[in-house]
Amino acid sequence: MEISWGRALWRNFLGQSPDWYKLALIIFLILNPLIFIISPFVAGWLLVAEFIFTLAMALKCYPLLPGGLLAIEAVFIGMTSAEHVREEVAANLEVLLLLMFMVAGIYFMKQLLLFIFTRLLLSIRSKMLLSLSFCMAAAFLSAFLDALTVVAVVISVAVGFYGIYHRVASSRTEDTDLQDDSHIDKHYKVVLEQFRGFLRSLMMHAGVGTALGGVMTMVGEPQNLIIAKAAGWHFGDFFLRMSPVTVPVLICGLLTCLLVEKLRCFGYGETLPEKVREVLQQFDDQSRHQRTRQDKIRLIVQAIIGVWLVTALALHLAEVGLIGLSVIILATSLTGVTDEHAIGKAFTESLPFTALLTVFFSVVAVIIDQQLFSPIIHFVLQASEHAQLSLFYIFNGLLSSISDNVFVGTIYINEAKAAMESGAITLKQYELLAVAINTGTNLPSVATPNGQAAFLFLLTSALAPLIRLSYGRMVWMALPYTLVLTLVGLLCVEFTLAPVTEWFMQMGWIATL
């Protein structure tokens, strides 16, 4: 019997999302106009809370859909205007170009990145050294590339290796269902469980590595570019400005990586089983023998393009998004990717998030029009200049750990810039606040998958169920990093940021514009 029209509409609305989630969104959409009539300020804060809720529930439904519906309604009832949204999008065009072109550009360098991580995994036998290498490699790559892409590459390596061993363990050459362990005998299951623990720890080290490297440069995370543009900094300026906080945090983060592996705590310490290593080594040897000259040339070309990418970013030869576009053109031209559909696949990863970021800017427009953050900023600016840095860092950190850090960083840097332009703070203090905002947005956000897009990407990937990586387990494994990164970052903002920045100025390395 066919279902009713009403039931069909309900099932189509937000698809597979739970009924309670659909109902909650409908209640939000009904309440917002009513509360807006009574108090626009309260309605504005309610919208922000609802939007954060959609981000926190990203596993139930991709936030673009519910967040987009809330944003459309906000414009429709007058919380902001379509013109203001357009202005916000125009002001942040560089960030949208970064997401569209840089992420797509790196997609065409995946073969090189896969080669690097495969060599690391099979060449280094010490688990502590391997974990450190993965963390450092992810940090270095994320300083120049998009963190999502770096994590995507590591996921590809892990899924590939898991599939190779799973086929051997199940005695099936065509093992299509990697989640089906029914054909694996007891001995192999024990080894497989150990292998899962090994892969979980490597994935978490790599994920945290993207946060450690991503905070250091203006292209490491999308919000970094927003903050850099607001402060008028280029690549080198941004790196030096952040270094009083980010360099000590990087060192402590890497030490934490070694410590958790040494102590075998928080789910770390599992080594690669020797039987798995033998299987993977055989497969890698076979792959290397089958690699043609054409394949080798592709790797060499991608390495050269990587050098161009780093050089162009460091010398600021063009806007970041345009450099990404040049990578797409060079990589496709020189590696023989000419089919439109093959090129189009590169954009599937970044465009949903680009659309979501545009929705962010709609909510930012509401925040500006309704002056929602004015009381918080007013409270922070009442404190001494020294205390302002820690307060901005803490407020950013609290919100970033449960919400998307692009959203949080955009809000706070806009408010700080408005305070500077109104004369409430000096330009010098504003530049220090920009560092506190950037580090506060990036470092504590490793606490949950909601804060780090790379973590959320890992949690929703095909790999997560294979290696038994749940939301709770990810939060638990991230806990030592969360504590160390957050506390070291706070101490650096409190004690080293101002004096080291002053010393950089005296040396002539940086200057207040």
From Swiss-Prot:
Name one cellular component (GO) term: plasma membrane
Keyword Metal-binding included in the entry's annotation: no
* A Pfam family hit: NhaB
Q: What's the catalysed reaction?
A: 2 Na(+)(in) + 3 H(+)(out) = 2 Na(+)(out) + 3 H(+)(in)
Family listed: Belongs to the NhaB Na(+)/H(+) (TC 2.A.34) antiporter family.
PANTHER family recorded for this chain? NA(+)_H(+) ANTIPORTER NHAB, TRANSPORTER ARSB-RELATED
The task this protein performs is described as:
Na(+)/H(+) antiporter that extrudes sodium in exchange for external protons.
Official protein name in the record: Na(+)/H(+) antiporter NhaB
Species of provenance: Escherichia coli (strain SMS-3-5 / SECEC)
